[in-house]
Amino acid sequence: MMKGQLAGLMRQAQQMQENMKKAQDALAEIIVEGESGGGLVKVSMSCRHDVKRVAIDPSLLADDKDMLEDLVAAAFNDALRKVESTSQEKMASVTAGMPLPAGMKLPF
């Protein structure tokens, strides 16, 4: 490989790294909301998996504890699915055109 080609690859890798950092910083600011029980339980989570808020409708507090626990778990899982989906969409623009191995997920 010629010196110029290597330098070009290094610049390209550095640019990609900077773009990945910007995308990850942007994802940290995105908040998604998972819910269950028709919106009776809601979980707000950043795309860095930080839970920001859990809201439980007061009508559930007098109900069955097991049901409430199931609804909270379902809301968390819904939020996680939304985080993964949003992250994949946002990172797709950064990784577009990069020759990544099949099944490789970013960020790592």
UniProtKB/Swiss-Prot annotation:
Homodimer. Coiled coil: none annotated. InterPro entries: YbaB-like_sf (IPR036894), YbaB/EbfC (IPR004401). The lineage of its organism: Bacteria, Pseudomonadati, Pseudomonadota, Betaproteobacteria, Burkholderiales. It comes from Bordetella petrii (strain ATCC BAA-461 / DSM 12804 / CCUG 43448). One of its GO terms (molecular function) is DNA binding. Keywords: Cytoplasm, DNA-binding. It holds the Pfam family YbaB_DNA_bd. It is found in: Cytoplasm, Nucleoid. One of its GO terms (cellular component) is cytosol. This is Nucleoid-associated protein Bpet3552. HAMAP family: DNA_YbaB_EbfC. Belongs to the YbaB/EbfC family. Binds to DNA and alters its conformation. May be involved in regulation of gene expression, nucleoid organization and DNA protection. The keyword Cytoplasm applies.
